Amino acid sequence: MSWLSTSLGKTSERAGCHRERADAINSGSSGAGPSDFRAFGLGGLGASSDLTESLRDLFKQMSETQEGFPPMMFLNALRTAFPQFAQKAKDGHGYAQQDAEEAWSQIVTQLRQKLKSNDASQEASESFIDKYMSGKFETVMECDEQAAKDGGEQPVKGEDTFLKLNCHITAEVNHLREGLAAGMQEKIEKNSEVLGRNSMYTKTSRIARLPKYLPVHFMRFDWRKDTSKKAKIMRKVTFPHELDAVEFCSEDLKKLLIPVRDKIREIRKEEEDVERARKRRKRIQHGEDVEPAEPKGKGPASETELAKEKKDSQKKASGSTDVEMEDVEYKTDAQIEAERTASILKAKKELLELVDGELLADDSCNKTGLYELRGVITHQGATADSGHYTSFVKKEGQKDPVTGKRKEEDGKWWWFNDDKVSEVDNDRIETLSGGGKY
């Protein structure tokens, strides 16, 4: 999520970005590669005070070294474009602490304005950000007072664009899903023409388009009027490694996504069953004790079957002639892998047939409703004006030099802490849900 990353904060603010879980649909990389950037005018390299060009240069420099270096050109461009980030610390030493989400939003807004497509096959006004990172809400605004409804005031329908989803944190929110649901309803005070005065309205939002990359902002910093400062909400809010966004979608979009999402889950289960069966055959082949994958029931009958299977496998392993044996031919790993590959290809074909033409026409939208967590930005500290930001990015599998495809991921993450980069286990990500240091 790291932009590809999910930002959750160090007991503080968290924000995050999920990448569409589409490994069962896309045969290639689901990310945007160099050719995609060139299509939006990010081809060359050269020192520049322009924020967009400086970011391009920064990405290129980072790709050419594993050593740490200060991104001064980019920082100078950011401070020039947005003077708030050039604010000095109150003690006069260095720059003031800034909010990561504010910096992210300003950078994305700038990129959205500057990165216009120069590809003849795309709309001239289309932005890279709009294409890959923007979603759409269908909204309904309705007055809370019955008197307005009785007077004939109708709900107002509209459409909004979003570049991130907000996870609102209240005393009732314990999980990301609950925080996102809270953000889908908003109370607004506005004038009612029917009542002739201000009244409270409820604005309900439902997602009509899911982007390929989805940032999620955990709203852990809240403005306190009594102290005139931002306070950090330390409440623990857990989050999944796979986000199912279907429940937040409009009814029309749900109808398109649910068949695809359910098919993906079915394919995963089949793959898991095949892998379990392969391991079980290996254990039997080597004469190891083995339990049936799914016992038919409890009681003497099942126990007898278990004992018989165990006894038979032991006799086969020892070559005993006490019982009549049939020759058993075991499949090789190559045969099993070939069958598995054929099964996956067939399942992918069936899956593609389930994807609606409307979704297929939009090559940069999410077609499954599922997102995989790829990165997390965290904040350590109790206040917004101090602390320390670090980030976690999920490791990609190594590229096979022969096929060019990436190998299976090992589930580990890179932890970026200033110029120090270290590898951490998946369990470390579970500690970033707040309620403590993070």
What are these regions (language model features)?
Residues 1-438:
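UBL (ubiquitin/ubiquitin-like) substrate-recognition surfaces
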